[in-house]
Regions:
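Extracytosolic ligand-binding ectodomains
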Residues: 1-365
Length: 365
C-alpha cells in the first residue's frame, strides 16, 4: 500500500508541476520509507523537519507510526496530511492544542467499523460474529471500534481473537470462532496475515464470510488468499473503475506510468488518496500564497476553491475543529471478485459516477 500511495502522490506532483507548479514554484518530493516501524518513523520525521526543511508532509500508512511520529510535525507547525492511516484518534491526538496541524483524507476506522457492522448485522442478518485483529495499534484500535459499533447494535462478538504480524497459522483463532458458532468473521489487520485467515478457513473446511477493514482490498490479501479470498467485503473510498472522466484519466495515467501486473493497482485506495492529498495541500499553499506552516494550516481549514480529486470533489473539507475530509456517506462496500475489488452492490455500481461529497452535518456530530 505504501508504494501505491507514493505512486499516486508522484502522479499528482507531476501533473501540478507540468501546469506550472504552485505560487510560481515546482513541488519537490522528498521520499522516505518508515518500514512500518515506529522508531524509524520518528527518525525520519526529525530528518524531514530539521535537515530537509519540508513545507508539509503527506503519508503514513501505518497508524502506529503516525501516532508515534506526527508529534514532531505538530511541534514544528508543519501540516501533515494522513492519506492512508485510519486509526480514529489520529486527527484528535492534538485536538486540545490551540492549533492542530494533523489532517486526514482517508476514512477513519470509526466510519469503517460502522460500515462493517452494518453489512454483517443489518444487511446480512448475522447474529453471531467473531473478530480477528492483529496485535498492532491499527488492529487493536480497530477492534475497539468494531466492538463499539457492535454494542450499538446490541451485539456481543462470540469470539475476539488476536494474532501477530508474520503469523502463518490461524487455526487456533479460527477454531475458537467456529466452535463459538460464528456466522461471519470481522477482521482488522494490516498485512498478508489476512490471507492466512482465508487460507485457514479453507484448511478447516469452514467457509463463512470475511468482512473487514479496507486492507482486505490489497493485492497481498487477494493474491495470497486466492479462491479463499473470493467474496471478502470491505469499505472502499475508491474502486478501480473509470466512473468519471477524472477517475479514468487517473487510472489510465497510473497504468501507463507504473505498469502494474494485470493492469491492477495493488492498492487503489492508497493510490487515489495519495493523489488527492497532494491536490488538497497544493490548493492550500496556493490560497495561502505561502509555504509557511501556520498559513497552510489556516488555508486548509478555510479552503475557498473546490478541489477535484478522484475519491471525491472536496468542498470545504476541513474546518478549525474538523480535520477529516471523509464522512460516512463517501465510502462504499467493495468485494473481492476474480482477483479484483469491485462494487459489492449493484446500486453502488450504478451510482459510481455520482459525486459523493462530504456530509457537513454528519461532520459536526
Amino acid at each position: 500500500m505504501g508504494v501505491s500511495m507514493r505512486d499516486g502522490v508522484k502522479l499528482a506532483v507531476e501533473e501540478i508541476n507540468k501546469s506550472g507548479g504552485v505560487i510560481g514554484r515546482k513541488l519537490q518530493l522528498v521520499e522516505r520509507d518508515d518500514e512500518a516501524k515506529n522508531e524509524r518513523g520518528v527518525q525520519i520525521a526529525q530528518e524531514l523537519i530539521n535537515k530537509e526543511k519540508v513545507t508539509a508532509m503527506v503519508g503514513y500508512i501505518n497508524s502506529g507510526v503516525s501516532l508515534a511520529s506526527q508529534r514532531f510535525f505538530q511541534e514544528a507547525k508543519i501540516p501533515v496530511m494522513n492519506n492512508v492511516a485510519t486509526a480514529t484518534v489520529i486527527t484528535q491526538q492534538f485536538k486540545a492544542q490551540p492549533e492542530n496541524y494533523i489532517f486526514r483524507n482517508s476514512a477513519a476506522d470509526s466510519i469503517q467499523a460502522a460500515m462493517i457492522v452494518e453489512e454483517a448485522i443489518t444487511r446480512s442478518g448475522y447474529k453471531k460474529v467473531a473478530i480477528l485483529a492483529d496485535s498492532t495499534n491499527y488492529g487493536q484500535l480497530g477492534r475497539e471500534d468494531l466492538e463499539k459499533a457492535l454494542t450499538a447494535k446490541g451485539i456481543k462478538p462470540v469470539a475476539v481473537e488476536k494474532f501477530n504480524i508474520k503469523d502463518v497459522d490461524m487455526t487456533a483463532q479460527l477454531l475458537k470462532a467456529k466452535e463459538a458458532g460464528a456466522e461471519a468473521v470481522l477482521t482488522y489487520a494490516i498485512g498478508p496475515e489476512l490471507a492466512q485467515i482465508a487460507n485457514g478457513m479453507t484448511k478447516l473446511g469452514w467457509k463463512v464470510p470475511m468482512i473487514g477493514s479496507w486492507t482486505l482490498s490489497m493485492a497481498n490479501f487477494i493474491d495470497n488468499a486466492g479462491p479463499g479470498g473470493e467474496g471478502a467485503r470491505m469499505p472502499q473510498t475508491f474502486i478501480q473503475q473509470a466512473d468519471t472522466p477524472k477517475r479514468k484519466a487517473f487510472i489510465d495515467a497510473y497504468l501507463k506510468t507504473f505498469k502494474p501486473k494485470n493492469n491492477r493497482i495493488d492498492s487503489p485506495v492508497s493510490a487515489a488518496q495519495g493523489y488527492d492529498s497532494i491536490y488538497l495541500l497544493a490548493a492550500a499553499i496556493k490560497q495561502a500564497n505561502s509555504t509557511e506552516g501556520p498559513k497552510i494550516r489556516e488555508a486548509l481549514e478555510n479552503l475557498n476553491a473546490k478541489v477535484e480529486g478522484v475519491v471525491t470533489t472536496y468542498d470545504k473539507p476541513f474546518t478549525k475543529t474538523d480535520h477529516e475530509a471523509i464522512t460516512a456517506n463517501i465510502p462504499v462496500l467493495g468485494e473481492v471478485k476474480q482477483g479484483r475489488v469491485v462494487y459489492a452492490y449493484a446500486e453502488d455500481m450504478k451510482k459510481g459516477g455520482d459525486l459523493r461529497v462530504k456530509d457537513a452535518k454528519a461532520a459536526k456530530k
